[in-house]
Amino acid sequence: MRLPQDIIIKPYITEKSNMEIGAGKYTFIVDVKSTKTEIKKAVEALFSVKVLQVNTMNFEGKVKRTGVHEGPRPAWKKAVVKIDTDPKPVEYLAKGGKTVTNNKKYKTSIEEFGVAQ
């Protein structure tokens, strides 16, 4: 099991990602080997939010030149994470048919992302 800090590398801030923050979508650069479920658990652990959806994109590293020498840039992975902006308490039935509510508090935004809504 990897730590959440090893999975989420840094936020990916562009004009498009700033516009999607209002809809609850945050963009991160993540570890290339990480899966969607690992990304979901890492974001929920780091930022105390409820993740609804994770979309990932893989990017191949470009070949760059310095004089006559060529070398590749590393491949990277981008994840767009949609969070629940209006979290409601979860209700379920316990033994005996009693209704139990889970009052876990989730945040409605990620303030640590660097951009306020």
UniProtKB/Swiss-Prot annotation:
Alphabetical list of Pfam families matching this protein: Ribosomal_L23 (PF00276)
Might you report a single GO cellular component term?
Answer: ribosome
Q: What is this protein called?
A: Large ribosomal subunit protein uL23
How does the record describe its quaternary structure? Part of the 50S ribosomal subunit. Contacts protein L29, and trigger factor when it is bound to the ribosome.
| Disulfides per UniProt | none
**Recorded name of the encoding gene:** rplW
- HAMAP family found in the cross-reference section: Ribosomal_uL23_B (MF_01369_B)
Keyword Ribonucleoprotein listed? The answer is yes
**Source organism of this protein record:** Ruminiclostridium cellulolyticum (strain ATCC 35319 / DSM 5812 / JCM 6584 / H10)
Protein's job: One of the early assembly proteins it binds 23S rRNA. One of the proteins that surrounds the polypeptide exit tunnel on the outside of the ribosome. Forms the main docking site for trigger factor binding to the ribosome.
Read off the PANTHER family from this record: 60S RIBOSOMAL PROTEIN L23A (PTHR11620)
Query: Could you cite one Gene Ontology molecular function of this protein?
Result: rRNA binding
One GO term (biological process): translation
Keywords attached to this entry: Ribonucleoprotein, Ribosomal protein, RNA-binding, rRNA-binding
What InterPro entries is this protein classified in? Nucleotide-bd_a/b_plait_sf, Ribosomal_uL23-like, Ribosomal_uL23/eL15/eS24_sf
Q: Which family does it belong to?
A: Belongs to the universal ribosomal protein uL23 family.
